[in-house]
């Protein structure tokens, strides 16, 4: 924003963000900062967000599953109680920062006694070098070496999830 303020000669500017435009994206912070600068009279700008392919939608399509009945969360640069989400939900879509997040998740699931989960992971979805991995918790050690370093979108399925109480009483 400070660059735009210092260079008013630039009247059409683009900012590119990787990932989903509305799912834990820096695009939202940028939009908010531009709106605040407009309100203060520092800038005069219009913001248009042009989405790409949603990683959750892409992974669900590749796997042939719906995602309207899933919980969406992220541990890519943030803290989330994934164990609790997986314990209480059959499907959890999750953004991960890399291989270390897989190791941490598997260890947390084991510590919590959640052993019967299937994890499907998409890497570089929609790109020519896209990869899909599916494994159960007990197969993790053998699959870890196949995982390239990078950001992942995962579907964690737990058929043994606890029944959720949807209404009081």
Predicted regions: what they are:
Residues 1-2, 53-55, 71-78, 97-98, ...:
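Short, acidic/turn-prone active-site loops that include or flank metal/cofactor-
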Residues 7-11, 43:
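Glycine-rich phosphate-binding loop signature in dinucleotide/nucleotide-binding domains
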Residues 2-8, 81-87, 142-145:
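Short amphipathic alpha-helix with an adjacent loop that forms part of the alpha/beta core around
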Residues 12-13, 88-169:
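A contiguous loop/helix-start segment that scaffolds small-molecule binding in enzyme catalytic cores
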Residues 19-90:
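Class I SAM-dependent methyltransferase SAM-binding "motif I" and its flanking Rossmann-like core
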Residues 2-5, 13-18, 22-33, 95, ...:
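Phosphate-bearing ligand-interacting subdomains
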Residues 6, 36-40, 151-154:
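Polar low-complexity intrinsically disordered regions
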């Amino acid at each position: 924003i400070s660059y735009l303020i210092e260079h008013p000669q630039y009247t059409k500017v683009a900012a590119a963000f990787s990932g989903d435009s509305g799912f834990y994206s820096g695009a939202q912070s940028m939009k908010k900062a531009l709106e605040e600068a407009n309100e203060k009279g520092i800038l005069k700008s219009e913001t248009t967000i042009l989405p790409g392919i949603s990683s959750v939608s892409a992974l669900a399509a590749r796997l042939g599953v719906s995602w309207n009945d899933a919980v969406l969360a992220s541990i890519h640069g943030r803290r989330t109680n994934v164990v609790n989400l997986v314990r209480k939900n059959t499907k959890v879509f999750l953004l991960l920062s890399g291989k270390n997040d897989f190791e941490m998740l598997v260890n947390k699931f084991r510590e919590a006694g959640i052993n019967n989960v299937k994890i499907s992971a998409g890497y570089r979805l929609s790109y020519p070098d896209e990869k899909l991995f599916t494994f159960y918790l007990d197969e993790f050690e053998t699959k870890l070496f196949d995982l390239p370093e990078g950001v992942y979108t995962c579907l964690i399925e737990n058929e043994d999830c606890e029944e959720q109480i949807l209404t009081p009483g």
